[in-house]
């Protein structure tokens, strides 16, 4: 009985963790899309400093996205 409860608790933890990671992935996808749209706006094309800042933000968001995606895939493989 204790073993079953422990297994159920572990499953619930993995589900919560997976849902949290999926939420973070979704937020990062939105952030990446938003930054890319900002970079394409005509009023921003000639503002090189702003574009550079956006480029740095985009690179960081993509890095975080890849890390979260890898974390999610590892979690799926071990479920």
Describe the function of each predicted region:
Residues 1-79:
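Charged, heptad-repeat coiled-coil alpha-helices that serve as long linker/dimerization "arms"
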């Amino acid at each position: 009985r204790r073993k079953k409860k422990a297994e159920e608790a572990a499953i619930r933890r993995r589900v919560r963790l997976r849902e949290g990671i999926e939420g973070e992935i979704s937020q990062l996808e939105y952030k990446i899309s938003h930054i890319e749209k900002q970079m394409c706006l005509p009023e921003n094309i000639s503002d090189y400093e702003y574009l550079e800042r956006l480029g740095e933000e985009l690179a960081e968001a993509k890095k975080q996205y890849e890390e979260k995606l890898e974390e999610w895939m590892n979690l799926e493989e071990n479920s």
